[in-house]
Amino acid sequence: MPQQVRLSRENSVKRSRSLTKSFRGLFKFNSPGSPPSSAATSDSSEMSGAQGGRGNGLLGGRTKKASISPKSEAQFTQRNKSAESVVSDEGVAMVASAGAQFYGRGKHESSPNVLMTGGEEAARAAGRASAESIALSEGGPPSIDTKLERVTPSLIYPQNGRAKHSSQRSRSASVGRNKERGGPTPAPIGSIREEESKKAHKCIIQQEHFTVDENGNHQHSLKVLPLIVQDPESHKPKLFSFSAVFKSHKNGEDEELSDAFSILPDYSTVLEKTLVEPLSEVKIFSEAAQPDENGGRTEANQPKDMPKIVNKHAAIGNEELKLINNLSETIHVGMQGPDKHSSPPQPFTCKATKSKQVLAEKYGKCIGMIGQGAYGTVWVTCRSLPQDNQTETHYPTETYERNGKLFYAIKEIKPRADEPNEKFSTRLTSEFVIGHSLSGGAGGTKRLTSHPNILKVLDLMQAHDVFIEVFEFCPSGDLFSLLTRSSKTGSGLHPLEADCFMKQLLNGVRYMHDHGVAHCDLKPENILFTPNGTLKLCDFGSSSVFQTAWEKRVHFQTGAVGSEPYVAPEEFIPKREYDTRLVDCWSCGIIYCTMVLGHYLWKIAIKEKDQIYSAFLDDMTTRGEYYVFENMRHVNQEVNRCRKMCLYNIFQWDPKKRITIPKLLDTPWMRRTKCCVNYRAAI
């Protein structure tokens, strides 16, 4: 059996993408057709080209549809007489029965730290549930196969018959705030579900940070950074942090960051002038165009050749393009100024307005550093709640709150020693604008609603030659740290916990795709958590804008982007264009398996370079199944079978056969998964 691949942070293929390549196809308005060919590839194309000899033989010329199992459906039906899933939307069955079924197989090696209570009652419940399931099988509702054929037309079945097509439900995630204010308030959309009854239910599954009661309701209790738990006024530089690195802030660095000011334009005031110089690649504004007396543009001065908006839901539209132009100029001036230690001139000036607030006034003082890498340093700031009717425009409150204090994460970004100023400017602008737009924007760019599973990007500031991004703060760290702590016990996460996180992950990714952006670097390090288990996607520096507001069709890209264990196989094929949405789907599957198993599926999806991935391809082409997926267990056999089918359809090395994110969310596995975040369906 191949050796397991241990978790590691050192596996990056590419960490950033230039703005112009992220927006490849911007203002190329050809007639709809096949994806445009790109002469210019990403920086990682050189690396993938070097791997060309290994990537060409990726599939070995052998393809075969993946089946769930070689065993017959009759055999499966005979043994699959379990109680209704505890995560079913149709009705909550007894978790005691499901728990007895799952843990009654013997001492499962992957769950040594699970405690069960109420053994005698569980046994009686299991007997009753078994009898009920037998009665249902004799004349009850349709089987799981019928449900699968009705709702998952894209899934690949072992039978020759094709699944019937069905329309997809149109759904969208709602806006929600992630606060932990005291007092009994109604749960807003996107927040943790409130219990319908205050009656205490018996806990039947209890882990360090995850519990499930007898009604099937679960609760996450993730650890909070000790830096936040203790008094921010007296923190000590010796405790746990996200990346296992903690340092107390230095006085000099603290003073430098505290003097930073926002470089975002103030849309609430009348502007004396606007930036009219666009990006060199995009000539869109007329030089004669000037703002009218109300700060807008007159009909005579509207931008020339402005393309028509055909996709109003896209994250990148007219307002974002203006912001890109503004920030590019501001950053460029700040980096090229004669005196880098003086405040650079601002492209926007306002009439009779207050001076811009510095970081210390707006977001509080730095209380500690929680991460450091080649691309920047992450700090935590703390301030008291706004007073005197101060508004969110000046004091954003959509962040973590504890004991009357707001906490923010700030990322200090400097250009690398060998990085040209122009490249640094486009990298920083791309990362900020994409994240800022997806998190709802602000002021004049507030077009989209925020999503509970997208980390909010609040501000971009400058202190001399240093630039600072401001985010909402997630005090429970990232998924990588959670998995690292869990793997020390010899197991991954509980299946119900992993399912909840998977559903949140897929909803966040679908929101990005619905707005024309693919993440392209999904991995545990880019998944953050709040203490109540709300998942947040972050780090949009490698994201690809595959469709803007002016484009009717999706464009593809080439070159490997991301971290090797999570990169889809088609990315390693030189000069091959691929759909970034399907790449994200592959990465989500890898992340889920990593959560359940506690280790990577493989190190890299290249047959000639990775023995485990090669064995996966051989097993799938010869037997139609993979032993890792076959050996996975769940609390319910039907859910386990649905999950297994989904995994086989996620890990289709031919992207044309791979399931999409919306269809994956519409499978019985995900629809029957209880998620601790409320999503409102849009009809």
Curated annotation (Swiss-Prot):
Entry keywords, A to Z: ATP-binding, Kinase, Nucleotide-binding, Serine/threonine-protein kinase, Transferase
Active site (catalytic residues): D521
Xref: Gene3D superfamilies: Transferase(Phosphotransferase) domain 1
Coiled-coil zones: none
Keyword Endoplasmic reticulum carried by entry: no
Biased composition (Polar residues): 69-85
Annotated ranges, domain Protein kinase: 364-670
UniProt-annotated stretches for the region Disordered: 1-90, 157-200
Biased composition (Gly residues): 50-60
Catalyzed reactions per annotation: L-seryl-[protein] + ATP = O-phospho-L-seryl-[protein] + ADP + H(+); L-threonyl-[protein] + ATP = O-phospho-L-threonyl-[protein] + ADP + H(+)
Record flagged with keyword Iron: no
EC numbers: 2.7.11.1
Pfam families on file: Pkinase
Biological-process GO terms, alphabetical: intracellular monoatomic cation homeostasis
Molecular function GO terms recorded: ATP binding; protein serine kinase activity; protein serine/threonine kinase activity
Low complexity composition bias: residue spans: 36-48
Residues reported in the UniProt entry to bind ATP: I370, G371, Q372, G373, A374, Y375, G376, T377, V378, K411
The family this protein is said to belong to: Belongs to the protein kinase superfamily. CAMK Ser/Thr protein kinase family. NPR/HAL subfamily. HAL5 sub-subfamily.
PANTHER family found in the cross-reference section: SERINE/THREONINE KINASE (PTHR24343), SERINE_THREONINE-PROTEIN KINASE HAL5-RELATED (PTHR24343:SF43)
Protein name: Probable serine/threonine-protein kinase HAL5-like
Upper lineage: Eukaryota, Fungi, Dikarya, Ascomycota, Saccharomycotina
